[in-house]
Amino acid sequence: MKPQDLKAPFFGEERKTQIKDDVLYIPEHYFKHGQFEMPSWEEFFGNNHPIFCELCSGNGDWVVAQANKNPNMNWIAVEKRFDRVRKIWSKMHNSQVRNLRIVCGEAQTFFRHYIQNEVIQRIVVNFPDPWPKSRHRKHRLFQYEFMNDIVRVLVDSGIIILATDDKNYLLQAIKIMQQRLLPKLEEPYYCKMLENYGDSWFERLWRSKGQEIFYTEFVKKVGI
């Protein structure tokens, strides 16, 4: 399968949430989420294995490798850009990965409107856009409001991991996560290597340019 084999699902006024070719499409600037009946996760995947989720999946190298290596885990790749979704979809099919589904849409919208409480075992956020300029920081993925949704969808003792090359972004994300979650790493709550993490296109890119990579890991408290 080539990336271009995945066709755009809607045009103009036909925009609506739908599942097609193992991809859940959530249109941008769309507000009729209640009109879509989300299938159960067992229906979505065809089994009841535990669910893991990657945000900012990019070209899909990391999540396809993880799904291939862990067939008893169900994986969700969330990526808002359709050109990248096509690449993930192509790699998924060419690798014959059966335990991966793709969400083409905003992570915040997907979490808020399409995921029930306490269903995700682990969330991995790989190299989100740092939006470094002060006037653009409102666009950052890590916000206090989104953290409430993260806590809601994680199971008790569920984990969230962030990988980034931007230390300022890292420190802001740690500050936000500390409000609702427990750090798994000792202070300063981040490390520069995480064992058995795998790698991604962005990680290889930034390391090739001599940039440091930072990882932080937090866990949901039981009963919150």
Swiss-Prot record:
Q: Which HAMAP family match?
A: tRNA_methyltr_TrmB (MF_01057)
Q: What is its EC number?
A: 2.1.1.33
Identify the SUPFAM superfamilies for this entry. Answer: S-adenosyl-L-methionine-dependent methyltransferases (SSF53335)
Gene Ontology terms, cellular component aspect?
tRNA methyltransferase complex
UniProt protein name? tRNA (guanine-N(7)-)-methyltransferase
Any idea which UniProt keywords this protein has?
Answer: Methyltransferase, S-adenosyl-L-methionine, Transferase, tRNA processing
Enzyme class of the recorded protein, top EC level: transferase
Pathway per its UniProt entry is: tRNA modification; N(7)-methylguanine-tRNA biosynthesis
Give the gene name: trmB
Q: Which family does it belong to?
A: Belongs to the class I-like SAM-binding methyltransferase superfamily. TrmB family.
Organism whose genome encodes this protein = Chlamydia abortus (strain DSM 27085 / S26/3)
